[in-house]
Amino acid sequence: VSKQEGVKNVFVRGLGDRYNATTFNGFPIPSEDPEYKNISLDFFSTDIIQTVGVNKAFNAGGSSDVGGANIDITSKELIGGGHFNIGVSGGFNTQTLTTDFLKMDGVNLLGIADKTQPGMENNYNFKNSLDPSEHDLQINRNYGVSGGKRFYVGPQKDALSFFLVAAHNTEYQYAEEVLRNTTTNGTIYKDQTGKVYEQKISQLALANLDYDYRNRHHLSYNFMMVHDNVQSVGDYDGMDSGKFNDDYDNMGFTRRQQANDNWLLVNQLMTNWGLTKTLSFDAGASYNVVKGSEPDRRINNLRKAAEGYTLLEGNSQQRYFSELNENDLNVKAGLTYRLADDQEEISNIRIGYNGRFVNDDFEATEYNMTVAHSSVFRLEDFSLDSYYNQENLKNGWFEIQRNVDKYTVKKDIHSAYVEAVYQFDAAWILNLGVKYDRVDICVDYDVNKGGEKGSGKIGKNYFLPSLNLKYNLTPKQAFRLGASKTYTLPQPKEISPYRYVGVNFNSQGNEKLQPSDNYNLDLKWDFNPTPTELVSLTAFYKYIKN
């Protein structure tokens, strides 16, 4: 398991975000960031999590949309009779202390961005300034509080407990970048240096309510809220012949101001009932809501001129608003019958059902502010607000063109499975299962300025066997064998042909993209020299088709 600098999510066995899966208390959980499949693990501090399991061998009862690992996070419950804690911390980055730090307009102290759009094209009604403000002495800070209490209710003194966590974090980063692109024959057509000022603001709230009835029936509710805002100002100066193609060595300046304001709400209800000494029933439902927005992204390009810099013509001056709304419903139920064995009494047969129903709605509005007559600017001190205003729009210095892109994705997954665990003796433990999944995905799109309209569908039936075998060679050594079939579904952004423009890249989905079939084989040797030490050797093979 590894994590790459600058990338939110982890890599497992060389497989990145789309091949891994994250569950929260056993339920699938979406990412707080629409660009990713998995939620960032940075949100889960030791104050929040009880355990984290990384499962690289798969069974019938687990996630099917996985190829690298399933990361299961169990939220913390109250231990003991009561708990209360307050934490405050601070720090600083020397680069942000000594730099006039640039902040974009339109984001408040809590990281909540102003998403107001101007509406009509013949009026310049943008609320946010194009000119970032300068700040100094940027201090990183973190606040957190957690607490809980256990009560005993009823004549049987049944346990009722709650646990709450709330946290706020603000941090600043400054980086100097180099953007360089070449043609296929190695000719450099883009060579720019950049200064990037980034501020990250996040809040997290978690609540757990837990009730035990007569030590046989269990009911729990979990809530989690994650708000994550990343805002940045990037100034890039240098040569770009693909953009600034003129007589001044193709030199120019680009300012990109961007805020990504994302919310994730999680609600989970779970119950477990001991029906008899050998039969138990469990069920649960989870409803997740993701709201991801990129409000008022501002891109301005200035080309080198005789007396300074002028605004580039065409669609090079842009303001952009996008919002993705995702509703994610998960349900599950299972019946477990415990079998008799002469060992650890872990043998059982289980049948179950999992269902996941996801709806994604995406809309992006782009305002191109086409230049007709440009002022001359000096990079040392310039104001774009002095040019882009209602008076200059009325006088014909520039015009506004508005375009809306939309796509929707609907995903339904029905899973039914049966699996068995049996311990033959002190050495051999077998887990054998099979799952049937029905996957239906529909995408409808009207994107790229109306140039691409259409729809696409994916309908698949999957039969997914799994085998896990453990052999205890000695009390300190064990061999494990795992074999399974899983799949990897394309993400919503990957099956819509919407074109996203980044700082140094463009990305576009393909509506004809198909799921991957994954064949997994694992062999592992574990050696425990002492109860607190572990030595492992693992060999694995994966065949990923499509």
Predicted regions and their residues:
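Extracytoplasmic beta-strand/coil segments of soluble accessory domains associated
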Residues: 1-28, 69-74
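Short acidic/polar hinge/loop motifs at secondary-structure boundaries
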Residues: 27-56, 101-102
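Surface-exposed extracellular loop regions of Gram-negative outer-membrane beta-barrel proteins
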Residues: 27-28, 291-293, 359, 385-397, ...
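A beta-strand signature from Gram-negative outer-membrane beta-barrel systems
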Residues: 43-87
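Transmembrane beta-barrel wall of Gram-negative outer-membrane proteins
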Residues: 128-235, 265, 465-467
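Outer-membrane beta-barrel signature, preferentially recognizing the C-terminal barrel domain
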Residues: 246-270, 401-414, 458, 487-544
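Membrane-embedded beta-barrel scaffold of Gram-negative outer-membrane proteins
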Residues: 280-286, 291-298, 348-350, 427, ...
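Signature of Gram-negative outer-membrane beta-barrel scaffolds
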Residues: 318, 322, 338-339, 344-474, ...
